[in-house]
Amino acid sequence: MTKPRSLAGNVGIAVFVIAFFCVVFAFFSASWLVSDSRITGAKFDRLGLWTHCFRSLPDPNDEYIRRFFVGCRWIFDPFTKGYDQIRGYLVPGFLVFTEFFYTLTFLATIFCAMLVLLFFLCFTPDHKRFVQLTLVIGSTLTCAGISAALAVVIFALFGNRGNWMPGHANNFFGWSFGVAIASIFALLISGGLFLVETNIQQKKRKYFKESQTRFEMEQETKA
């Protein structure tokens, strides 16, 4: 008879699904920092990790203000003239670190998605590698949560300072940033639940081995 997964493992799957979608939305969406839409004449609109949107941004490298950037563009856009020349302005050091840590989070989450599918579809507690699988999932998700936390803290400290995006007083953290915060908790909770599942299954296996040993000793005594 196949042993059932514990409640921790089943809840861990559900929380991981939430974490997965939070990470994906935060990674690809462009609303980490947004401008108040009620402000007329604002130069900045919104931005994410990989996309910047402007209403009318003057070229910061042009002292005569002859060129403006309008609309949403990928930060590595190769087609807009002059966009590569302001990349240092668009992607300062703190944003590079934010992108780095949240990219690690994204990759770890994708990796765990494959492992969670194995856990859900193919592995049962009877499988000899079940404990190792849950340990890897739990540890990786916990590390992903820590990496996401680092990304969020860095962006929170430096993302809305007055020396970066124009209209600082009217800018605020958007829904993408909120989703990134939610991803931290979802990742850490799901990682913790998978580690609890690991501990439960280890104890069950230890108890089963001890029971089997006692049974064998009793049989030998009777014989």
What are these regions (language model features)?
Residues 29-100:
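A surface-exposed beta-alpha-beta supersecondary segment
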